[in-house]
């Protein structure tokens, strides 16, 4: 239920970094995603999370470039902060604190700022739907470490982040659906203090 280190099956062998190898429409949409993410000062939303073994949670998600916080209400009170290559979760019920490194975890790709999907990142897929856009990325030099998929609504050319999906090196799936999204609102710096 907690953001397990995200993983991937089926991404092995030599990887091509960046997205120059993709078709023009895909490159255009990737640049749109980069521009959107780099243009955010903040994003706040309610979330519903699916995790390993059908575990679920919900609460509030806050993102600013390079950091995010998740405050869980279900299944019980927990707070998680991702920043500086780390993910720290504190369970308010029992005081337990969990530390995960995001250095080689695809969730860490969301913490890069500015966001750029070239050089050491491999874009593995770009797909479009009715008023939606989805982009999947992995570490170019070691894609078997995991896959991160960002899901956007795409209404009249305006992107909004509405989902984050991932699979980790142990094949654990992580999914976060965002709703009631508010962008570029003031956020307290205390939101990103690491739980102790």
Residue ranges and their predicted role:
Residues 40-42, 56-58, 65, 75, ...:
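Extracytoplasmic
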Residues 31-52, 90-147:
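Flexible, processing/modification-adjacent segments and terminal tails
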Residues 118-119, 128-196:
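Gly/Pro-enriched, hydrophobic low-complexity segments
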Residues 49, 72-76, 84-86, 93, ...:
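A mature extracytoplasmic/lumenal domain signature
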Residues 58-111, 174:
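An acidic-aromatic
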Residues 1-3, 14:
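N-terminal export leaders
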Residues 8-11:
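Bacterial Sec-type N-terminal signal peptides, specifically the leucine/valine-rich hydrophobic h-region
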Residues 14-56, 64-66, 194-196:
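N-terminal leader/targeting segments and the immediate start of mature chains
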């Amino acid at each position: 239920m907690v953001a397990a280190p995200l993983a991937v099956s089926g991404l092995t062998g030599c990887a091509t970094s960046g997205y120059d190898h993709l078709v023009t429409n895909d490159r255009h949409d990737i640049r749109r995603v980069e521009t959107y993410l780099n243009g955010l000062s903040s994003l706040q939303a309610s979330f519903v999370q699916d995790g390993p073994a059908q575990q679920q949670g919900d609460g509030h998600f806050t993102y600013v470039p390079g950091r995010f916080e998740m405050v869980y209400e279900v299944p019980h009170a927990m707070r998680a902060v991702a920043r500086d290559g780390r993910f720290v979760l504190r369970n308010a019920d029992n005081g337990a604190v969990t530390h995960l490194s995001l250095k080689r975890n695809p969730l860490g790709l969301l913490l890069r700022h500015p966001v750029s999907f070239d050089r050491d990142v491999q874009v593995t897929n770009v797909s479009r739907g009715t008023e939606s856009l989805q982009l999947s990325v992995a570490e170019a030099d070691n894609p078997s470490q995991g896959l991160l998929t960002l899901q956007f609504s795409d209404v009249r050319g305006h992107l909004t982040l509405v989902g984050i999906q991932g699979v980790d090196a142990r094949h654990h799936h992580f999914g976060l659906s965002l709703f009631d999204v508010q962008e570029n609102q003031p956020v307290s710096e205390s939101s990103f203090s690491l739980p102790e």
